[in-house]
C-alpha cells in the first residue's frame, strides 16, 4: 500500500504503526480517530465503516476510515472482543497552539486481556490476562484481572495442568517471555491459538519498585518471574496508574478439588454443553447473587472447591445462618441490589477513567453499607461477626455527597458536576453567569422598548455567540450606528452591540473558569477515592462473600438442599440424591431421587441398564453433589455424608475432538489414562460406557482391564456404567465391586417404561431395541432387529445381504469371547483386491486422524475403480 513519506502526519503515523504492527492504530485527528492503510481496509469491514481515501487523486491514495472520538469505545470493544489489539494515539498538545506537527503518542494498548469494564454493567465475568513461564520441570502461571485488581500465581509440574488452569480461568490473552517464545510457542500456540486466545510477547526487564512491591509475598522464583513478565506487559501497554492491583498471592492447586475442562464440560458446571449458555448449567441454577462481585466470586468458588474441611465448614455455617433467618437474608439482598461493582469502580478511579456518574454510583453503594451492617448485627453471632467486618466508609460517601451533584453529565469537561455551596469560586462564577443571564433578559426588554420591535429577541449561537435578531420587515427601525450586522438569515438579520459583546466576554470567561474549576475539584474528589482504594477493595470482598453465601442459602431454601457432613472414613452415604439442574426443569415431583451408598468395603458400582434410563444422570448428580459440598454449599439430597475428595475424573458422553484429529475412542483412552495416571484413593472416578468407540471385544477387554486396574491399584470411589453385561460377573470375584442397574419394566403390550431408579444387582438385558423403537425407527426395522436378536441369543447365524450374495457367519454357542465374528467373505479373487488388502494392512488405523481416514478411503475407492 502506498505511503506518502513527504507528509509529516503520515511520517508520524508510520513511526507509531511500526511500533504496533499487530494492532489497529486509532490515530487522533481533531474530533475523530482515523484508521489508515490496511487498518482502514480491515477495520471498515469489521466495524462497517465508510472507507475513503487520503489524497484521492494521487497515484497512491491512502485508504482511511474515521470514528468519532466520543463513540470510539464501542468500536474498540468490537475489535477487542474479536481478538484484536487497539493502540490509541492521542494528541499530546493543543493543535491551536502547537508549533509545527502536533505531538502524538500511544496512551494505551487495549488487548483482549486488558479490556476494562465500567462499574455499572453488572458484569459477572472476570477478564483474565495470564503469563506462562516454563522453568526447570515446572510451569508457573501468573494472572491478573485488570478490571478488578486481582493478581495471583501458581506452579504446576504438568503442562496439561497449565492448560486446565487457563481454561478454567477463561483467560483471554497469554503473555510469554520473548526469550521463551521460540521454545514454547509451538506447544502453547497449538493449544491456545486455535481456541481464540491471543498470545503476546514481553521482553524481560529488571523489576521496577512497583513490581517488586507487588511480588514481595511470592516465594517461588519462577512465580516471581512470571508475575514480573505479566506486570511489565501491563505497565508497558496501559501507561497509567494501576494502584488498584493488589499484591500477588500464591496458591497451591492441591488445596482445591481438581477437575479438568472435560469434567467441567461434562457436568455443565458453568455453561450448558449443548447451548454454550449459562442457562441450563449448575452455575445458572445457583447464581442468585445481586452484585457483580458476588457473581464472579460464586463462579470462582464453583470452579475451585475446597479440600480443607475447616474452611468448608466455615462457609456452611454462614449458609446455615442465612437459611435459618429468612428475614435477615431478604433484608440483606434488598440492600445488595443498591450496590454497584465496587471492584471495578475502584479500578477506574485508580486508572483515572472514573467519571462523575461513577462517583455517584460509588456513593450510592456506600450508602447501602450501614443498612447491611445494621441487618447483620441484629442477627445471630455468626452473621453479626460478619457484619462487624464491614467498613461503611461514611467519610468518603459524605465527601462525594456534598461535592458531586446527584445527576451529573457523562462528560467531566463540561461543568455542572459540583454542588452549589461546595466551592466559593465556583459559586462566584455561577453568580456572574446568573447575573449576566438576567442582564440578557433585561436587554431584550430594553431593546424592544427602544426600537418598538416586539418580535426582537436576544439569542445565542455556538458559532457566532450572542446576538440580537430582527425580522427583515423591521430592519429599518434600527439605529444603524449602534448595531453591527453579524449574520443574515432568510427572513431575519442578526446584530451585535458593544454592550452585548462586552457581556459575552464576561460570560465566556466565567463559563471557562467555572468549567476548569469544576474539573479541578472533580479530580480532587476522584483522587480522594483513589487514596481509599484498598478500603473499597476490602469492602468489596466482604460484600461479595455475603452475596454468595446468602445466594447459596436462597438456593438451599428454594431447592430443598441439605447441609452435607464430612467424614474421615472412605464412605459415600447419600439418601435421595438429585441432579439439581435436571430436577429444576422438570415438573415438581417428576424427578426420581436415588440413594448413592458406597461404604468402606465397596469402591465401585458397576452400573448396567438401558440407554435413556438415567445412568449418566445418576453419575453426574454424584459429582455435582460433591462439588457443591466442597465449595461450601448445601446439596440436593435428604442426607449427604461424604469424604473430602482430591480430584474428580469423568468420561461421560462422546466428545470427539475432530479439530485436534482425535476420534471418540482416542479421546476415551486419553481421558481414561488421565484418571489411571493421576487418581488416588481419595478421588472420584466416573466412567460412562467406556470402550464403545472400538470393536466389541476390544472394548470389552479394555473395560474389564480398566475396572480391574482401578480396583487393584487405585481404590478410588468409582461409578462405571457399561453396556457390556458380560462384565457384571466381575463383582463375583472382586469384593469391592457391586452391581447396580437402572430399573425398567415392560408392560403387557411389550412397551418399555423406565423407572429411573438405581436397584441392586445387574440388569437382565439392555433393552436396546426398545430404545430404538422409542426413537422412532421404522417398525419393519425394529421387527427385523428383534428377530435377529432372538437368533443371536439362540446361537444361530448373522445374515448380511448384498446385491450379489448372502454371506453367513455362524456364531457357535461355546465360542470364546476373544474370537471375532467374520461378517464378510474376504476371499481374495484378483490382483486389484489384493492391492486394496495390502493397502489396508499398511494403514496405521489407531493413529489416523478423521481427515487421514477420509483421504485413505478416497484412495481405496480410486483403486477399486
From Swiss-Prot:
Functional note: This protein is involved in the repair of mismatches in DNA. It is possible that it carries out the mismatch recognition step. This protein has a weak ATPase activity.
Source organism (scientific name): Leuconostoc citreum (strain KM20)
SUPFAM superfamilies from the UniProt entry: DNA repair protein MutS, domain I, DNA repair protein MutS, domain II, DNA repair protein MutS, domain III, P-loop containing nucleoside triphosphate hydrolases
GO biological process terms on file: mismatch repair
Record-stated family: Belongs to the DNA mismatch repair MutS family.
NCBIfam families linked to this entry: mutS1 (TIGR01070), PRK05399.1 (NF003810)
GO CC annotation, single: cytosol
Positions annotated to bind ATP: 609-616
UniProt xrefs under CDD domains: ABC_MutS1 (cd03284)
Protein name: DNA mismatch repair protein MutS
Record GO terms (molecular function): ATP binding; ATP-dependent DNA damage sensor activity; damaged DNA binding; mismatched DNA binding
Superkingdom of origin organism: Bacteria
Stored Pfam families: MutS_I (PF01624), MutS_II (PF05188), MutS_III (PF05192), MutS_IV (PF05190), MutS_V (PF00488)
KW 4Fe-4S (keyword) present: no
Keywords recorded for this protein, A-Z: ATP-binding, DNA damage, DNA repair, DNA-binding, Nucleotide-binding
PROSITE patterns: DNA_MISMATCH_REPAIR_2 (PS00486)
